[in-house]
Curated annotation (Swiss-Prot):
This is AP-1 complex subunit mu-1. GO terms for cellular component: clathrin adaptor complex; clathrin-coated vesicle membrane; Golgi apparatus. Adaptor protein complex 1 (AP-1) is a heterotetramer composed of two large adaptins (gamma-type subunit and beta-type subunit), a medium adaptin (mu-type subunit) and a small adaptin (sigma-type subunit). The lineage of its organism: Eukaryota, Viridiplantae, Streptophyta, Embryophyta, Tracheophyta. GO terms for biological process: intracellular protein transport; vesicle-mediated transport. The gene is AP1M1. Residues 170-426 form the MHD domain. It comes from the Eukaryota. Disruption phenotype: Growth retardation phenotype. InterPro entries: Adaptor_comp_med_subunit (IPR050431), AP2_Mu_C_sf (IPR036168), AP_mu_sigma_su (IPR022775), Clathrin_mu (IPR001392), Clathrin_mu_CS (IPR018240), Longin-like_dom_sf (IPR011012), MHD (IPR028565). Subunit of clathrin-associated adaptor protein complex 1 that plays a role in protein sorting at the trans-Golgi network and early endosomes (TGN/EE). The AP complexes mediate the recruitment of clathrin to membranes and the recognition of sorting signals within the cytosolic tails of transmembrane cargo molecules. Functions redundantly with AP1M2 in multiple post-Golgi trafficking pathways leading from the TGN to the vacuole, the plasma membrane, and the cell-division plane. It is found in: Golgi apparatus; Cytoplasmic vesicle, Clathrin-coated vesicle membrane. Keywords: Cytoplasmic vesicle, Golgi apparatus, Membrane, Protein transport, Transport. It is a peripheral membrane protein.
Amino acid sequence: MAGAASALFLLDIKGRVLVWRDYRGDVTAAQAERFFTKLIETEGDSQSNDPVAYDNGVTYMFVQHSNIYLMIASRQNCNAASLLFFLHRVVDVFKHYFEELEEESLRDNFVVVYELLDEMMDFGYPQFTEARILSEFIKTDAYRMEVTQRPPMAVTNSVSWRSEGLKFKKNEVFLDVIESVNILVNSNGQIVRSDVVGALKMRTYLSGMPECKLGLNDRILLEAQGRAIKGKAIDLEDIKFHQCVRLARFENDRTISFIPPDGSFDLMTYRLSTQVKPLIWVEAHIERHSRSRVEMLVKARSQFKDRSYATSVEIELPVPTDAYNPDVRTSLGSAAYAPEKDALVWKIQYFYGNKEHTLKADFHLPSIAAEEATPERKAPIRVKFEIPKFIVSGIQVRYLKIIEKSGYQAHPWVRYITMAGEYELRLM
């Protein structure tokens, strides 16, 4: 069998991801950016009309329709002609459903789009591409989706992610709203990359076949419905749901309704691309007092509210590769020299909001280290931390209801955590 598609992307004319579906888990959303960069690089070349491109182990096949790019990324030795034909069939199906395949129609019907992509391709292999067949399963009416009546669950095994007959002495649900902050600051102190990747992670210990309903705060719900809101809206992108979520219900009233799997799973993932203020800012100054002695002064400042605090803070500060015998003093926490990393690691257990702490260090260098010595490394400052009870996006769980026919009482637990993702400051 020919190689399969890894993922399918729908991009706007500027290369921004509108919708993407990951089929095999061997590529990431970053493939869209690499594809569009490749597309721009070849613009004007004799091969610029080639619908197939290859870069760093990934083959890209694409077609353009109106202001939309439909692109398949594959890490396998795939049949490009077959997948290009499939993309044209996808265009035909979308036109059947939405009349015009435009950016607006995709945004207004993203739940329908995901349903169609799931029916048309399975694990990267094309399945149903006839609009008439798909219409038997998925119907639309004025941008609203209606899923036709299906056979009972026992016949279709539509709850394949959950076994029947589960029993627990204590019925509990744990929901963690976790956001990872990615920051890259250049040597001039400018933020060159900033985004937040979020996930609603669940652990369920529930008997029977429970029905769960999760409601998020109004700033997300109202924005999704295109209505006026008060205060700053939460503009989430690249939203992906676990297969247990009833997408039709979410499309109708923005309620996340589902029968959960047993154990741990990601209910929902998302991304926030608006620029985020660095939660912990670090400045470092290095001064050479002689050919054999270097002094380092570091200031770390928390830039979040007083009532919050960061825990397990770890600041990795690069030092000259030939440094030895450090003398370190900190206003808070402890620091240790890690020669295997050529770094000084500063650890702070609790770092409260709107506070500044300092580190001073003296390093000795070999006496032969003069101006002719090896140039200093330009490694970045790396920061790790966790901030409990704090979320950058402002997303909040309004309610989490668990209903099961036996009528037992379940205990839901919700917590919020913000942590450092790829958090680097190239200031040294």
